[in-house]
């Protein structure tokens, strides 16, 4: 099989790159080995939340110079400020065309409410998620936080107790309660099946929609705003929007323990757009090895195509980090399993020195989290000291930064994905 571009990995980075390439007329295939990290995400995306020094980032544009000086090997530093902002804006436009219903911009980070009642910086968030701008007070004075009877992945009282500690919510009057939804009685018999996705699947049929609306109205007791777990609306926000109209109140939803409906919805919309544009998904397949000649990848072999290699003019490595097996670790080394690319990390990290992988304090940023493949300003992958002409990397498989520490994982994924798509189209 021959394609213009082979993309290894079907998560946020891989699909974003694939959509951008298909829109430019490239024939792409995505080798997808299962669920991606986006299926477990909060639905909010971060461009850059903190500097390596720990300082909170409100304005990416103003903070970039300091950031690039502190972390020159970060993909943002390699790409340059103007390109990063251009690609971030391009993704905002893509999200609008996909009807992902996101709010936010590169001009200023906002704060989103977490499932435990904290506030976390974000670049983009679903418009159904409660957010505040900086130190501004939350616009509603009375909030009803409602869980679902028997559903343990969302704790209203814990959320309320923590939410009160934030200055933006000190003026709010909070109440908590639980919804009794008889439709879910069958799920309660098996705790393993009583998850957000299962709940959404049952409620999607709307067999007792009016009863659900009445139950919410009764439980809110006239509150201006309602916080619910994200269990309403499987494929998109349409069910949630209908519920909000019927209740005639301002309803917000909060991500639950994984799997997360907010992330799953985004994943589905990206995948559907890629396939509608003519892209091919090889689901349940896994890249194993590649033939490399004269600094170029000639062909790739997968678990389901070990005898019939897949070839392409360009290849994109979008396999993610350890979570999705984009990186692996033995006792004495961290490595990228498909191309055996060069590994880099942050200061003092050595991929073959196990003692350098971890920090002494459990709560400190862990050096192994900064490991990933080495790239240049074109996102080309380095192997044996040389940059590959037709192999690019996007997302968290790239090394040299700790996305958890900096709050930049989603931003790196989409910015590098769109930058790589531009490089390939212009090649």
From Swiss-Prot:
Q: Which GO terms describe its cellular component?
A: glycerol-3-phosphate dehydrogenase (FAD) complex
**Molecular functions per Gene Ontology:** glycerol-3-phosphate dehydrogenase (quinone) activity
**UniProt-listed GO biological process terms:** glycerol catabolic process
Q: Does this UniProt record's set of keywords contain Cell wall biogenesis/degradation?
A: no
Q: Kindly list the cofactors needed.
A: FMN
Disulfide bridge positions per record:
none
Give, as one word, the top-level EC class.
oxidoreductase
Per its UniProt record, what InterPro entries does this chain match? FAD-dep_OxRdtase_2_FAD-bd, FAD-oxidoreductase_2, FAD/NAD-bd_sf, G3P_DH_GlpB_su
The biological pathway it contributes to is:
Polyol metabolism; glycerol degradation via glycerol kinase pathway; glycerone phosphate from sn-glycerol 3-phosphate (anaerobic route): step 1/1
Q: How does it assemble?
A: Composed of a catalytic GlpA/B dimer and of membrane bound GlpC.
Q: What family is this protein classified in? A: Belongs to the anaerobic G-3-P dehydrogenase subunit B family.
Name of the molecule in the record: Anaerobic glycerol-3-phosphate dehydrogenase subunit B
* Species lineage: Bacteria, Pseudomonadati, Pseudomonadota, Gammaproteobacteria, Pasteurellales
């Amino acid at each position: 099989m021959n394609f213009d571009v082979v993309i290894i990995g079907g998560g946020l980075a891989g699909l974003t790159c694939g959509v951008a390439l298909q829109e430019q007329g490239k024939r792409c295939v995505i080798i997808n080995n299962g669920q991606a990290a986006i299926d477990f995400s909060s639905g909010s995306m971060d461009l850059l939340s903190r500097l390596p020094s720990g300082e909170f980032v409100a304005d990416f544009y103003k903070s970039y110079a300091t950031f690039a000086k502190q972390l020159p090997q970060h993909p943002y530093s390699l790409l340059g400020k103007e390109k990063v902002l251009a690609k971030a804006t391009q993704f905002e436009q893509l999200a609008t065309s996909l009807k992902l219903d996101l709010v936010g911009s590169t001009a200023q980070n906002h704060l989103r409410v977490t499932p435990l009642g904290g506030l976390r910086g974000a670049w983009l968030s679903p418009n159904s998620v409660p957010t505040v701008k900086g130190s501004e007070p939350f616009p509603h004075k009375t909030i009803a936080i409602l869980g679902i009877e028997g559903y343990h992945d969302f704790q209203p009282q814990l959320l309320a107790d923590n939410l009160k500690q934030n200055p933006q919510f000190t003026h709010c009057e909070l109440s908590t309660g639980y919804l009794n939804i008889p439709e879910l009685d069958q799920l309660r018999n098996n705790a393993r099946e009583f998850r957000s996705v299962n709940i959404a699947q049952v409620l999607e049929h709307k067999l007792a929609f009016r009863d659900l609306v009445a139950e919410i109205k009764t439980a809110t007791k006239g509150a201006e705003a309602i916080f619910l777990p994200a269990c309403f609306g499987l494929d998109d926000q349409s069910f949630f929007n209908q519920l909000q109209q019927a209740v005639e109140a301002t309803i917000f939803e909060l991500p639950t323990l994984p799997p997360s409906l907010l992330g799953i919805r985004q994943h589905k919309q990206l995948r559907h757009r890629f396939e509608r544009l003519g892209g091919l998904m090889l689901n349940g397949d896994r890249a194993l090895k590649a033939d490399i000649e004269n600094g170029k990848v000639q062909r790739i072999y997968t678990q389901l195509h070990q005898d019939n290699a897949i070839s392409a003019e360009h290849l994109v490595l979008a396999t993610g980090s350890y979570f999705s097996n984009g990186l692996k670790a033995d006792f004495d080394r961290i490595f990228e399993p498909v191309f055996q690319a060069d590994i880099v990390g942050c200061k003092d990290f050595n991929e073959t020195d196990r003692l350098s992988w971890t920090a002494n304090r459990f709560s400190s940023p862990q050096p192994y989290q900064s490991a990933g493949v080495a790239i240049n300003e074109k996102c080309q992958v380095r192997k044996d000291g040389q940059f590959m002409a037709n192999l690019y990397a996007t997302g968290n498989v790239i090394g040299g930064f700790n996305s958890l520490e900096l709050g930049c994982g989603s931003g790196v994924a989409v910015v590098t994905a769109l930058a790589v798509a531009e490089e390939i189209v212009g090649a």
